Regions:
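Short loop/edge segments at beta-strand edges and connector loops
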Residues: 83, 172-174
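Short, solvent-exposed coil/turn segments
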Residues: 50, 75, 127, 173, ...
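Long, positively charged amphipathic alpha-helical accessory segments at protein N-termini or as interdomain linkers
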Residues: 1-29, 35-38, 42, 143-146, ...
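Conserved active-site carboxylates
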Residues: 177
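N-terminal lobe of the biotin/lipoate ligase/transferase fold
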Residues: 2-155, 163
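Short connector loops at helix/strand junctions that flank enzyme active sites
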Residues: 103, 127-131, 173, 183, ...
Length: 327
């Protein structure tokens, strides 16, 4: 554990701590403490400095704790926790490529990502100690093609978990965003390595907004919300992650056995754009049509406005077509 994370542990109680005392505890100079505080502030922690009193982490912080997570879950997955990491997905993908001998279900958690990313290379804001950043390793024997609908299933697991902590119902935006009241609260990134018809290795990345700091909110270019904003009480991330791991395991086992056969109707019941006119943007073209939901393969069903012909779409970005009137 590096000194930056040790400083966070000291400040997590929300009280003032002098730079001198922190330095003595860690065996470093006050100048070094000041440098670490600056770095921590730059990655999203609201740390105040008052002459004569020291440093204070506004509101305190409940840090992730693997023992606590395991106490609230009956799963035996291998769990790793990093205070700071470039990307949990990148880390697992690097282990896959180095043939590290990962065990199915191996899960990486982090307090902060310095290079967090979503689909299509978009940046995922990952401030320290604020949200859930999780990546899980899985294997499938039936090839890459069989994993094409997995992000749909994972979206359901995430939505089901969030629904346990709030009275508001989550909606699902194809292919892998979770919304509450039309605002994004979670995203999923599934990456794969392997053979078309043989064994494939999967990394399931999940990012969930729990308590967004103001300093990070300014960098988000779309409507968003977080769990503390829509819940009646503050969320313990350790309890939340334990419930999430259980949901991920249940949904993954169901997907392994039956793909989306028993899941797609539940997804359609929570489709954020059900029967609305949407615009689908892909690398090659744009389409406008009515969103009819998904089929058993996870393909988006898009009805042409003029011809009423329904096409199946397997890739792209969906957004509401607000300027067009619904039929």
């Amino acid at each position: 554990m590096d000194n930056k994370h040790k400083i966070v542990q000291i400040l997590a109680d929300g009280n003032f701590h002098s730079g001198e005392v922190i330095g003595e505890q860690l065996g470093i100079s006050r100048a070094a403490v000041s440098g670490h505080i600056k770095t921590l502030s730059n990655i999203g922690l609201d740390i105040y400095s008052i002459t004569g009193k020291g440093y204070q982490l506004a509101g305190g912080l409940t840090l992730l704790n693997l023992k606590s997570i395991r106490q609230h879950s009956n799963l035996t997955n291998e769990l790793e926790l990093f205070p700071i990491i470039p990307s949990t997905n990148e880390y697992l993908m690097s282990l896959i490529k180095s043939k590290n001998g990962l065990v199915d279900g191996h899960t990486i958690l982090a307090e902060c990502q310095t290079k967090g990313r979503g689909r299509r290379g978009k940046t995922w804001q990952s401030p320290y100690g604020s949200h859930v950043y999780l990546s899980q390793y899985r294997t499938m024997d039936s090839g890459l093609s069989a994993a094409s609908g997995l992000s749909i299933a994972i979206g359901l697991a995430v939505a089901n978990t969030i629904n346990q902590f709030t009275k508001l119902q989550c909606q699902l935006k194809w292919p892998n965003d979770v919304l509450v009241d039309g605002k994004k609260i979670a995203g999923i990134l599934v990456e794969a390595e392997g053979q078309t018809d043989g064994v494939c290795h999967l990394v399931i990345g999940v990012g969930i907004n729990i308590n967004m700091p103001e300093s990070s909110a300014d960098y988000i270019e779309q409507p968003w919300t977080d769990l503390n904003n829509i819940s009646d009480e503050l969320i313990d991330r350790n309890v939340f992650i334990a419930k999430l791991l259980q949901q991920l395991d249940e949904v993954y086992q169901e997907y392994q056995l039956h793909r989306l056969d028993n899941l797609y109707e539940q997804w359609n019941d929570n489709n954020a754009f059900a029967n609305l006119t949407v615009e689908l943007s892909s690398v090659t073209k744009k389409q406008v049509g009515k969103c009819l939901g998904i089929d058993t393969n996870g393909a988006l069903l898009l009805e042409d406005i003029s011809t009423k012909v329904v096409s199946k779409v397997f890739g792209g970005e969906v957004s509401l077509r607000k300027k067009l009137k619904e039929n």
